[in-house]
Every structure is written in structure tokens, then in C-alpha cells.
């Protein structure tokens, strides 16, 4: 990564790649990939350890876990879960604003003040006219509050504060640091996106900082970051709060249960290997999950979502029709048995029935790697860690035959094979069923044109398309000339270049 400032690194997008579509996760992670290679970037041959290592500016922006294991390690990264790109091309990460005062005005709803914690400094920091009036109200009890003690705002105190604001005008009430909740109208505005260089001036607490039911920070000291360093700071210094513990990692890493207990090297392998899963015949959502699975499935674009709220008019294997509340019919076409770029089978299955009530954005059909609108990469199987007469020596495992009989890990792949008939110096190639030195048994699945029938079952070595190519002729004996004149035998001047099933394919 090229250095912009001491605490920032830049990335850029180069070239066009074929999208990875085997499963929802691989498509999503491919679209969120970052690269430091290419024109204007680094070279993998000359990139040292320093530019590959995790940097403090990566926090909440580039995942420290998900990266390739080969020569591109550290040069190819992944966007963190909540990271986004600003107008100038730099990565930003969100933080929650920690409020240290509460605005009290004549129009303030007293209920919004209930639950805030008043401290020994609250009365001292009030404007002088408000302090004088407060001495004859419920706030007079604050004079006896000792340092470190907190008094919760009750309905009575909240009403007195609003009454003071009506008499003396709007004022700021010093309270225990707190963050707003999702039900607060200020919540969205309190979420700030910052690039790496701007966050250096703030004390930022971790997402696991202890909060009470009203969002107050109740500990006197909290673990925080300031100017790129981790430290323990008094709660009064905290300016921002992480939005989530998973904001430092990518989507793939956030799918690993109990990630905090994993060794970093094994977590890297797990995040990369999840993308390599192939879609199964019967996807099954995991029993042990992290809560990100449903959002990953939606954001991948492979799950069909309802265009409007309404009632399902029809639900078939190829189309779902929803009658919206606006009276219009909304058609949702499903993708059936389409080959992906990696040769896997793209297939969408309806999960709603006729007459069901749906809302806008609700999943209507699963993809090949989801179940019930939730990411499903594998199967829930019962595992035992035990000895079994040496059958599981070292890295060997024993499997129940039910896994095979019930097609638990069976997948469908669609391969595309092409053949071309070219004009050569010795003459044109020909697609034909008349192939020299090939028995009738090998031609049984070919039509008159030499092309395999649709639905034929083939194995490795079977002919898919018959093709012959001219070859240089050698002098023929009189017997060969006679046979060629009588039977039209071409064995002497053509060779078999038919397209056959590759080894290992059935």
C-alpha cells in the first residue's frame, strides 16, 4: 500500500475480473476485494514485509484476517464489514458519538431526559441563572452528590429541568457520557464515518464497553484508542464508540463462530476456505451461526426479494407473481440450472406459496447456497472426537454411509466443452459420425451429424463430437487404391480429432 500519511494507506482498483458465482459468499467477497497490485501499485516481487503487515489504519477498514496465503499475502485484502469508500477514494469506518451533555429547552420531551446520569459536576456547570433557580427545585439535592457518585434523572427531575428551560432559556446539562439507542431520533445522526487520518484526534472506545439499559457508560475507565495507540482512559475523555465488535473484520471472517478464540492463521484459512464451498443439492442453514448469514444472503443478490408488499398470486419453479397493495402484479423470474463462471449450477427455488402475505424486501426464493433466506454453505453433521481402531489416524476421518446415501454432500456441476472445425493447409476439418478406426459401440450416442444426443450418459473417453482432420497422404499401394475406390475409405488421409470426455468426468 502506498503511504499517504503516517497512519493512512491507499488502494486502487485495476482491471476487470470474471465474477466468482459458485455461492453467495464468494460473489460478495469478490466484489469487496481490495488490491495493492497493478499499474501504479506494488509489485509482489519487490513488496517487503512492512507493506504486507497489518497496519493500525486498517482498523475497521481492511480486514486483518482475510488475505491470500501465497505470494499475494498482505497485498490483496478485503473491505471490513462496515467500511465504505468516500468521495475521495479513502476508506471510512463508522463510530457512534459519545454525548456528554443533554440539551434542555422549552420544547424538550421530559421522557428523553429520563435515564441520564447526573454527576457531582452537573450543577456546577449549569449557567448562573439556572443554578440560582435550581437551588429551590429538585436539583438542590445535587449539592450533596460526592465525586464519583451518579444520580439518575427521574420523571420529577426531568420535569423540573424543562421548567427551568422555559424560565431561563435553553441550556446544556452535563451528564455521564452516553450513546443514543436505535429508538432515539438522533441515533442515525450520531453515527459518524471517519477516514484513518481524522480518527487520530479522538478517544475511541471499543464496542464491548459496558453500557446500562439507557446507554450510559458506567465504568470509570474504558479500553480505548488514541492516535493509533491502545490505552485505558477515563470515561470522560471518550469521544466515540465502535459500532460493533465485528467491524474490524471482513464479512467472511465475521461468519466464523467464536472467531475470538481462533488462532489468527487458522482463522485466515477458514475465511478463505468458506469461499471455496460448492453449492449442494439440499442446502442446510447452520445450527451454530453468528447472525451475519441472513444479511450476506440478501446482499449477495442471489436471493429473490419481493418488489412490493402484497399477496402471492402464484408460485412456480420458474416464476413468482405478487399482487401488490397498489393493485399491480409484480413478476419475479427465477434462474434455473444456469452454469456459473466456475462450472457450478445456479438454481433458485421458491420458498413462498400461493396466498402467502409478503412484505417488500422479503426473500421469495432461495439460491443454490441459501435456505430460508439464510446462507447455507454445508450440512449440520454430528462429529465425534474419539479413537476408532486407527481408522482416523492423523488427518484421516471416518464418515457415515448415510452422508452418501442421502446425498448430503452431493453437488451438480455444469461443464462447457467446445470444439471448432477449422480450415487447415491440407483441407477443412469435418464434424462427422464417420470416424476412422472407431467401432459402432463408441458411436452409439452420436446423431447423424456426429454430435452427442441430449440426455446421453457419458464417461471419461466417450466421444462428444466426432471430428476428423486431414493429414498428409503417403503413397498408396494398389490394394489401398482399390479399397478407396470401392468403399470410399478415408482412413488413409484423415485422423481422429474428436472431442472426448476428459478423465475424471462422468
Identify the function of each model-found stretch:
Residues 4-5, 9, 16-506:
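Intrinsically disordered, low-complexity regulatory segments
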